[in-house]
Structure formats: C-alpha cells, structure tokens
Amino acid sequence: MTELYAVIGHPIDHSQSPFIHQEFARQTGLGLDYERLLSPLDGFEATVRQFIGRGGKGLNVTLPFKLEACQLSGALTERARAADAVNTLTFRDGQIQGDNTDGVGLVRDIVDNLDVRIQGKRLLLLGAGGAVRGVLQPLLAQHPASLTVANRTVTKAEALVTHFAQWGEVDAAGYDDLAGQQFDIVINGTSTGLSGNDLPLPAGLLAGSELVYDMVYGKGLTPFLARGQAERAGMLSDGLGMLVEQAAESWHIWHGGRPNTRPVMNSLRERLA
C-alpha cells in the first residue's frame, strides 16, 4: 500500500524534499507518494487537517509554519520543545506528533559527513532567529567547550541564553564583541547567505577556524563561505548536507531504518549545479 506524505510551506515550489524522499524510497523499495503542499498563510491548520482527511501519514514543515506546527502538535519531543518549532509532523493513533530534525541534521552533517568533532570545540553561531533556535539543543548535547550566539541585536541572543540554560551553557554577544576571539567552528544561521548582504563581522574572525558552515545552500559558495575562503578558514561547507540529513531523520521517524544519505547528497548537488 502506498502511503501519503508531503512538505508544507508558503512558498513551496523550491522545496527539494520530494526529490530527497523519493530517492530514499528508491533505496529502500518502499512505496510512497510525497507531494508539495502549498498552504495559505492564514490556513495552515485547515490545510493540515484536510491532508489528514486524505489519509496523509506525515508532513515536513518549512517556512513560515514551524511555530504553528508546534502549536498544533498534541505531543512534542524534547528537541521540538527546546526549539519551539516543529519541522516533522506524524499522524498516528488520532494524534498529531511534532518533532524537529534540523539540529540532528546539522550535527550529523558536521560529525559524520565532514568528520569534524564538536565535543570540546569552541562554537560560534551567527544569528538568533528560528534557524539557530532549532539547532542549539542538539549542538549542546555534543558537549562543546563553549557555545556563543552572536547577533546584531544582542538582547535576542541573550533570550536564547535564558531559554536554553536547562540544556547547557550558552554565551551571548554582539558582532563587535567578537573582535580578538577565535572559534573552532563558526556556523551562519542568518539569512544573509540568501540575500547576499555581508555580516558586520570583525576582520579575520574566520581565519583560525577548523570549519566555517553556512546553513543555506545553493550553486557555488555563499557570500559567507566566500568570506571564509578569503580568510583562509580550514574547511567550508554549505547546508545541503544538513537538508538531506534532517530529511533522513524524518524518514527514520516515519518508517524506521536509516537511508544512505551520501548518494542523495551527490545527486542533489548535481541537480543544483
């Protein structure tokens, strides 16, 4: 029997999730339909319930509905509660279950695909929005030596320090506060990689870093990664691997087992070239 899944968002035409999940299905021999589901901005819950009525088993949730998905969920995992956001909905036994796989996707990409250890490292996350909030708890679970969140508006970073205190120690900073500091892993969680606007970071901040990582992805280097290259950072990576790994975690939640992500990453990279 073919099961029905989808990715929901607004807009949604750009989503690579159908390609990724169909590739996973091809690996495992599992029959499934996976759609793109465009929801009106003011009609998320109605669209979800209509999908459930069609026999839908699960949804991946993208912008701008991750907070609404959290509010709609009758049961939340710890990582979803920490993030205050849900990107994976499962419809089981009449209940809507919410999870967030973004953070574990990032961790797996860094640790498994890039072979970079997080434990004992000095981490810097740029930005204090939903992308950073979604990955902090899984990063803290890796026991870095330190984790600093830097943001243009320092009070937003300080709010994350308070919220995540139960999961580990987080430091807050403004971009100017980073002058003279060194970090092993620097992760961009802002949207500047999409807009092309440069972050007002101190010159040379990325020079001594083992890994410079941008959560966004696309053709070639993002502006942030180009800066890392110019400052001679050790390794550069965009967020394509994170995208595939968070999808693999959703697959595991829905179907069990773990698909082989490497060939899917390679195929997706070719599609985007």
From Swiss-Prot:
Describe the reaction catalysed, as an equation. Answer: shikimate + NADP(+) = 3-dehydroshikimate + NADPH + H(+)
Pathway field of the UniProt record reads: Metabolic intermediate biosynthesis; chorismate biosynthesis; chorismate from D-erythrose 4-phosphate and phosphoenolpyruvate: step 4/7
| Name of this protein | Shikimate dehydrogenase (NADP(+))
Could you tell me the keywords of this UniProt record? Amino-acid biosynthesis, Aromatic amino acid biosynthesis, NADP, Oxidoreductase
Q: Where does NADP(+) bind?
A: 78, 127-131, 151-156, 215, 239
Looking up Pfam families in the UniProt record yields:
SDH_C, Shikimate_DH, Shikimate_dh_N
SUPFAM superfamilies reported for this sequence? Aminoacid dehydrogenase-like, N-terminal domain, NAD(P)-binding Rossmann-fold domains
- Name the gene that codes for it: aroE
What this chain does, per the entry, is described as: Involved in the biosynthesis of the chorismate, which leads to the biosynthesis of aromatic amino acids. Catalyzes the reversible NADPH linked reduction of 3-dehydroshikimate (DHSA) to yield shikimate (SA).
Q: Which family is this protein grouped under?
A: Belongs to the shikimate dehydrogenase family.
Top enzyme category:
oxidoreductase
Catalytic residues?
66
Which branch of life, at top level? Answer: Bacteria
Q: Where does shikimate bind?
A: 15-17, 62, 87, 102, 217
What are its GO cellular component terms? cytosol
Q: Which NCBIfam families match?
A: aroE, PRK00258.1-2
According to its UniProt entry, this protein's organism is Laribacter hongkongensis (strain HLHK9)
GO biological process per UniProt: amino acid biosynthetic process; aromatic amino acid family biosynthetic process; chorismate biosynthetic process; shikimate metabolic process
Q: What is its EC number?
A: 1.1.1.25
Q: What subunit structure does UniProt give?
A: Homodimer.
> GO: which molecular function terms?
NADP binding; shikimate 3-dehydrogenase (NADP+) activity
